[in-house]
Design a protein with these regions (language model features):
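Positively charged, low-complexity intrinsically disordered leader regions
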Residues: 74-86
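Generic structural signal of hydrophobic/aromatic residues within well-ordered alpha-helices
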Residues: 33, 37, 69-74, 179, ...
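Glycine- and acidic
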Residues: 82, 106-107, 322-323, 409-413
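Conserved C-terminal alpha-helix-loop-beta "cap" of PLP-dependent enzymes
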Residues: 5-19, 26, 301-302, 335-449, ...
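Conserved PLP-enzyme active-site core in the AAT-like
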Residues: 2-50, 55-69, 88-109, 113-344, ...
Length: 460
């Protein structure tokens, strides 16, 4: 987030966009929010959208659209027969493929309706039963798809990822000694792949350095192990590499993205995060045979991305790479909120790429895990302010074993202004000042049929 400098007013550029369309918000009372919490069984995920002031539940698929994206939606430039099915011979697909080659360096792309579809197809093709996948605290959907194919996941993330107070700038890095030990223990032939998530959500949106990616590439090549990336947050990761890694401060974002991809054999990604669209997933590969299998599987599963959505994705990539200020503003807003809260409130350090994470155990030390402290804190903050937080994806197994519990403040791109972040700051600071008044919750038995169903809670 830029600021005015008296000696160089030409640097003033805090917000790289102006507001073209607005959605009025309803101002709720304390009583309204009390009723909403009761109706939602104290689960903030279940609160209706019109009763929320600032929604930090997720940044996925809820970013504001640019005027160029709206133009693409209003009248596709490349409309043609069959565009709704997005055949790979269409102009929309050709345009997307060319953008992917230029920006990411992969010759083959399969565009799907969402990231988990791309993951499901890719793991089905590449992950074999009774094998091992080495990863760095992978996202729950990635873990699920790997395990559904009968493989075991070994976490080889750096130890600093488990130290919430550590200021290590690259807590998403792979521990190369752990990785080498896993290869030696299981044998390279038993390892289906090395799978690395960029800007690891589970440990606070923490990036992976390019030096680390290149070292992983060297190990993978030496042992003939495929190396894949979850590149859903590749732009955030690349921006943080530009800010934190020596030798990249003057590099263009597109160059860092390309160099990141050059380390991998393939990537899967959700387009709903960094690519600032509301639908779409990508599977990028260098291997024609794998591409053909994946393309056929996408057709069979009925998850091919429609042509209009492809065009919207191309337009978004054009916008992002034309002006790095979009990503600077996105990461800068997270950094601003983190710094506003960092003086006293227990947070994951350092600031991540897409969200601020509260250390729930340190925030509410008087509540045991059985009292659902993260859910209780989210309910309290909503009750007092109308700001919605949710616990987010389940903790990684290595975090659960250590008793770590985080509450995520995910900031959608181009949606909120500094005033909103100041209001969030006030809400969290109020909760922290009154933390000893926050009481735990009890789970209503059988309220959730599976771990993906929203649970119901009640106050004791």
């Amino acid at each position: 987030m830029g600021g005015m400098k008296a000696d160089s007013p030409g640097t003033i550029f805090s917000v790289p966009y102006e507001i073209a369309v607005v959605r009025p918000l309803r101002q709720t009372t304390l009583g309204d929010r009390d009723d909403a919490l009761r109706a939602a069984h104290y689960n903030t995920e279940l609160i209706p959208q019109d009763l929320i002031y600032i929604d930090l539940c997720t940044d996925s698929g809820v970013s504001s659209l640019s005027t160029s994206q709206l133009s693409a939606l209003a009248g596709p430039k490349f409309a043609e027969p069959g565009m709704g099915l997005a055949p790979e011979g269409s102009r929309a697909y050709a345009l997307l493929s060319e953008q992917i080659r230029q920006s990411f360096g992969f010759p083959y792309v399969v565009a799907t309706t969402q990231g988990r579809s791309a993951e499901r197809i890719w793991t089905k093709i590449n992950i074999k039963p009774d094998t091992v996948v080495a990863g760095n605290m992978l996202f729950p959907s990635t873990r699920n798809h790997i395990e559904l194919n009968g493989a075991k996941i070994i976490d080889v993330i750096t130890e600093s990822a488990h130290d919430l107070a550590s200021s290590d700038p690259f807590k998403g890095n792979v521990d190369l000694e752990k990785l080498a030990a896993a290869i030696e223990q299981h044998g390279a032939e038993k390892i289906s792949c090395i799978y690395v998530e960029l800007c690891v959500n589970a440990c606070g949106g923490q990036p992976v350095s390019l030096a680390n990616l290149k070292a992983v590439r060297t190990l993978a090549t030496a042992h003939k192990i495929p190396f894949f990336l979850d590149a859903s947050r590749i732009l955030e990761n690349s921006f943080l590499v530009k800010e934190r890694e020596r030798g990249y401060h003057d590099r263009r974002l597109r160059e860092i993205v390309s160099e990141t991809c050059a380390a991998a054999d393939a990537c899967t990604m959700s387009a709903l995060k960094d690519l600032l669209v509301s639908s779409g997933g990508l599977l990028l590969t260098r291997d024609r045979g794998s591409y053909q299998k994946a393309s056929m599987q996408a057709f069979i599963d009925g998850v091919q991305l429609p042509g209009v959505a492809m065009e919207l994705l191309v337009t978004s990539l054009d916008d992002i790479f034309a002006s790095e200020s979009t990503m600077a503003n996105r990461v800068g807003q997270v950094n601003y909120l983190w710094h506003r809260l960092s003086d006293g409130v227990p947070l994951v350090k350092p600031a991540g790429g897409h969200a601020v994470f509260l250390d729930v155990r340190a925030f509410l030390p008087h509540l045991s895990p059985e009292q659902f402290p993260a859910e209780a804190l989210a309910a309290f903050i909503y009750h007092m302010s109308g700001v919605r937080l949710t616990k987010g994806p389940p903790a990684a197994p290595s975090q659960a074993r250590r008793g770590l519990e985080l509450l995520r403040l995910a900031i959608p791109a181009r949606k909120y202004l500094r005033g909103h972040m100041d209001d969030v700051t006030e809400a969290v600071l109020y909760a922290y000042a009154h933390r000893h008044e926050i009481k735990g919750l009890k789970r209503v038995e059988d309220s959730a049929r599976s771990k993906y169903d929203p649970a119901h809670f009640r106050q004791p």
